[in-house]
């Protein structure tokens, strides 16, 4: 049996909503270190990882590691109840699945929902082990504009370094998109260890950026020479939502 309390119900369901961009069912793994969920698209191009360490949880108790598989439609029924940042969310294991309590700490209002879930063994949390030479941080709104633009002109986007700038391009002659990103214009941070360039699916980039919605925090994007792109946002109340996009070689 397990019981966890996360201090921000809105952030927690932003995690869940992000994963639904990749899968129709969600597997939550409860371990001694915290909670994680990892999902791949069928073509194995896009990976979504939710990772919430136990030290950011208001309460965390677990008898033994376990996983629960939830249907997305069931989870989305309760998303509307988690609109307040003042609300906490409590997950408790039951014989048939999960009991979810959303409690508004300001008003004292409480909602309790029971969801059926398939229980199983904890999955292995594996992700690409690569050294990414380029890292930059910006707001989700900036990435959202880029994602919308590149998908309008082509199926593939190319990202590269050019001196102290990031260059993003897509499309062919006559229908082409080019953007340059620099420190403070509009990047918050920029680190280039070595020059690099790589190409990715524009649609998968758009799907990953869509998964960032709901997190009011800057996003870090990392890439290397023909290596997977990593998109990482840390929730205000703790925990990371990470997307990996395989390169087009």
Swiss-Prot record:
It comes from the Archaea. The keyword DNA-binding applies. InterPro entries: DNA_clamp_sf, Pr_cel_nuc_antig, Pr_cel_nuc_antig_N. The keyword Oxidoreductase does not apply. Keywords: DNA replication, DNA-binding. One of its GO terms (biological process) is leading strand elongation. GO terms for molecular function: DNA binding; DNA polymerase processivity factor activity. HAMAP family: DNApol_clamp_arch (MF_00317). Belongs to the PCNA family. NCBIfam families: PRK01115.1-1. One of the sliding clamp subunits that acts as a moving platform for DNA processing. Responsible for tethering the catalytic subunit of DNA polymerase to DNA during high-speed replication. Heterotrimer stimulates the Holliday junction resolvase Hjc. DNA polymerase I, DNA ligase and the flap endonuclease may be constitutively associated with the PCNA heterotrimer forming a scanning complex able to couple DNA synthesis and Okazaki fragment maturation. Forms heterodimers with PCNA2, which then recruit PCNA3; does not form homotrimers. The heterodimers interact with RfcS homotetramers. Heterotrimer which circularizes head-to-tail (head is at N-terminus, tail is at C-terminus) to form a toroid; DNA passes through its center. Replication factor C (RFC) is required to load the toroid on the DNA. Heterotrimer interacts, probably via this subunit, with flap endonuclease 1 (fen), Hjc, Dpo4, and XPF. This is DNA polymerase sliding clamp 1. It comes from Saccharolobus solfataricus (strain ATCC 35092 / DSM 1617 / JCM 11322 / P2) (Sulfolobus solfataricus). The lineage of its organism: Archaea, Thermoproteota, Thermoprotei, Sulfolobales, Sulfolobaceae.
């Amino acid at each position: 049996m397990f019981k966890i309390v996360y201090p921000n119900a809105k952030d927690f369901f932003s995690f869940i909503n992000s994963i639904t961009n990749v899968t129709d069912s969600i597997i939550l793994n409860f371990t001694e270190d915290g909670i994680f969920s990892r999902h791949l698209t069928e073509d194995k191009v896009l990976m979504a990882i939710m990772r919430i360490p136990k030290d950011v949880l208001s309460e965390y108790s677990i008898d033994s590691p376990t996983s629960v598989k939830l249907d997305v439609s069931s989870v989305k029924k309760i998303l509307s109840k988690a609109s307040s940042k003042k609300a906490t969310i409590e997950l408790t294991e039951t014989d048939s699945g999960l009991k979810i309590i959303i409690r508004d700490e300001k008003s004292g209002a409480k909602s309790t929902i029971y969801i059926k879930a398939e229980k199983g063994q904890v999955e292995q949390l594996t992700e690409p082990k690569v050294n990414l030479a380029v890292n930059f941080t910006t707001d989700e709104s900036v990435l959202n504009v880029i994602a919308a633009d590149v998908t309008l002109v082509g199926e593939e986007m190319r990202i590269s370094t050019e001196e102290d700038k990031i260059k993003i391009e897509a499309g062919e002659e006559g229908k082409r998109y080019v953007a340059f990103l620099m420190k403070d214009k509009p990047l918050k941070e920029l680190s280039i260890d070595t020059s690099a360039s790589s190409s990715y699916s524009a649609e998968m980039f758009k799907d990953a950026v869509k998964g960032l919605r709901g997190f009011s925090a800057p996003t870090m994007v990392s890439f290397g020479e023909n290596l997977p792109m990593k998109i990482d946002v840390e929730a205000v109340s703790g925990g990371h939502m990470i997307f990996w996009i395989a390169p087009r070689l």
